[in-house]
Amino acid sequence: MDEHNVHHFWGISPAVDLGTLLPTGDGAADLPVDQPVRFLQVAPYDARHTLTTLSRACRHPALMRQLPPGQPACRLYVWEDSPEGLARHVLLAAVLLDGGVPAAQRGQLLLELHGNAVLRRRAAEYLDEKARQLESLFVGLAAGQPPPAGPEAEARGLAALAALLDLSLLKFQEKDLIVEALQRWRLPNPTSSTSTSAASASAAAAPYDMVAAWDGRCRKVYGERYDFRRNMVDWDYHMRLQPAGTPGCDPASGSIIHFHHFRHWRLHGVAHELRDSAYNSANRCRGEGGVGEFKDRTGRDVGRSVSAWGFWADVLNSPYHAFGTACEQPEFYRITNKQFVRTAVDVAEHNIAALLHELRTGRRLELGEGQEAHRAQAARGPTTLEDLTAAAEEAAAAASGAGAEAGAGAGPGGEAAAGASSSSGKEEAAAAAAAGKEQGQGEGQGEDWTAGSGSGAPGAGTGQAVAEGREGPGGPQDSDPAAAASTAAPAAAAAAASSSSTSVPTYSSGGRAQVAKAMAAAAAAAGAGAGAGAEASSSGAASAASAAPTAGASSGAADGKAAEAAAAPLDEAAREQMAAEEAAVRAAEAALDAAARQRAGRFRLVLVTGDLAKTLTGRAKYAGAFSGLSLGHRHTHMLEPQYKLAAAAAPGARLVAENARHVLQLSQEQAALFAAKMDELAAAGGWRPLPAAQRPPGITEAAAVYVRAA
């Protein structure tokens, strides 16, 4: 195991709905009647259990009970070994509740902040803005100030987050360390800072080269085999990850984590490349301080080193296990040609969208009859044979179409022009695709939200860039240039037509399907009316010009003004209709976000760090208080009796402990020994394995389930 892997940013098991750990049937009578249900997460490494439990609370009546005013229905206690881990936990919960960002972009931001080492510029600006908001929130809560109020704080979820957080078990020093971690997440030169105080505070933020930090970690891990790291990635995937299989599927089918995605993350730290954008800004919430402890030759503690801020995390085990391997929809596990049709990136994006949908509506997100499983907007290279075939067909069609258009426009010399075009079609298509990609880099297409007030930020930052050469044959590739050119040509023609016709309304809908359809219909109607008026104007002008040129010119001008006057009411009506529909959509979205914040108000998130036994589990107040517990794989030693997890668990409480099934540093035999040692520690700590028939739903083979011994 890597001794420098001192910080953990994600777990290696799927997210667990802690509500499934509650007893059902006759056992439900053992739950506290007038007290909230309590869950304890020991080193979850991220907020996946919290987000899943919040979103799926409607499935469990015990979490939806009406208790006295001011009393939550559920308390989630989260212990992390570092204050930075708690700060990241709160950050992901804040993104989920942020109603100022559309739901689709919110899910993408959450995945990027969770698993990417480098971000889009806009995502980095959002992190900067959210860090400032959380810093102000923590300072206010620590000082006993009233929570944020006002429409802006309500819409951005700050008021709901203030009601959700409980800092009563944190020491003053630990609160200060959380605030210090949030301050480090600021951008060195943010474009969204408008006030002098914010600019001066951000000036103290140190630059952070995540690309160099990632490369340094890889050099430390691989050592003298650094130059052959691609071979090591190939070995880890095919000899360790693939045999472990996919939850709920035959292990012979391999892993749903695609090799292209896994290799790209191992080499560059980008797990979710969801937009055709430039990922060139450091994910500053992945930087933490490393403190070395020193002992003399007798084993006596002789002090600690000064904390050094850097990247000290895992670069071997990918973050796809958290949200990308387990799914409630069986359509994502369809296999064709002995491989999964969907990948972990598709599953992760669907799972986050499903969590948001269920939190906002109280209903599960189900695929309709005949509806295709979700596919991410930009996959990393062709992931199926169907993708390869479609890309080849599109490239051939684009090349032949380019040659035909050039031949038709050449006139008498069309044959020679067609020959030249057919030979150089791919080069022209590549140039067009490159130009289009330069225009679309950085910001992503169709976004209507801004981070803070910096809406005019440049698309591509001047900081780091993922130092990636093009992958070799069979590796991750960008979309085919010819196919990109074939799709870019109609878009360019439509843009030219819309710019030349003043009667067609232009409107940014942010990608919402309803408003997009209404906009297209209104534009078509306005274009038809303008075309009819222009045709009548041209015919009248031509007939008049044959008799009297001067009169014909004046008649054509009059007809043109009449056509514009006739189209003006239609144009204004279309704009008003689209504005009304957009307002209705925004009102509906705001209502859904308000409902999500109301459901989250039934919970309290209690943050804990430091000595767990002294702060929480060893206190008489919490004896037998927790109905369910979870434990991370790097902290299985806390099953020992001295940490008193069994003493804090209620009778019959269940513990979900992450095992080493997906730890790539261990072979299958070593992972089996790890599981056997876990069982030994659990038995000594007062836990016994839960029979397989009683295993709660949604918990995969990546975790062991124990029940408190009587």
From Swiss-Prot:
Q: Which InterPro entries match?
A: DNAAF3, DNAAF3_C, DUF4470
Q: Which stretches does the entry tag as region Disordered?
A: 403-487
Compartments in which it is found: Cytoplasm
If researchers knock out this gene, what phenotype do they report? Nonmotile flagella, with paralyzed half-length flagella and disrupted outer dynein arms assembly.
Any GO BP: axonemal dynein complex assembly
Q: Which UniProt keywords apply?
A: Cilium biogenesis/degradation, Cytoplasm
Q: Name one GO cellular component term.
A: cytoplasm
Q: Which Pfam families match?
A: DUF4470, DUF4471
Q: Which residues form the signal peptide?
A: none
Q: Where is the composition biased (Gly residues)?
A: 404-416, 453-462
Q: Where is the composition biased (Low complexity)?
A: 417-438, 478-487
Membership in a protein family: Belongs to the DNAAF3 family.
In UniProt terms, what function does this protein have?
A: Required for the assembly of axonemal inner and outer dynein arms. Involved in preassembly of dyneins into complexes before their transport into cilia.
Could you identify this protein by its name? Dynein axonemal assembly factor 3 homolog
This protein's encoding gene: DAB1
